[in-house]
Amino acid sequence: MVAEMIGVVDDDASILRAVQRLLGSLGFTVKTFGSGEDLLASDCLERIHCLVLDVHLGGLSGFELQERLSEAPVQIPIIFITAHDDPPTRDRARRAGAVEYLRKPFDEHALIGAIEKALGRR
């Protein structure tokens, strides 16, 4: 069986490394991207089962990227993450259809639970 692919978009390399290590240790295939533009230019969008997406990115914001992805034929479940948490941002993430919204630094169990929820495992 092919491992489910999780995409992670964040402009913080330490977050990308930590999430890749964690999810890789659980058997997921993990693709990391330093920007929304990098994700859009990649050839693996159709293979991503879930996207962990930073709200505040250089270039396209997480919300702008989510808007573009919402026009695609296949919808990817999104988990928004952010270090700049506030009620309007949380509300916007929920309105955008986020599976989950996590504040950095987030607990690894919270991320795993959110991914399981996004993949329909719970």
Residue ranges with predicted function:
Residues P88, F106-E116:
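C-terminal output helix
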Residues D54, T82:
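Active-site residues of response regulator receiver
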Residues L16, G58:
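The feature encodes the CheY-like receiver
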Residues A3-A13, V19, L23:
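Conserved acidic segment of CheY-like receiver
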Residues T32-C50:
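Acidic, metal-coordinating helix/loop segments flanking the phosphotransfer/catalytic sites
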Residues F63-V74:
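Short amphipathic alpha-helix used as the core "switch/output" element in two-component signaling
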Residues G34-S35, S61-E64:
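Acidic catalytic/metal-coordinating carboxylates
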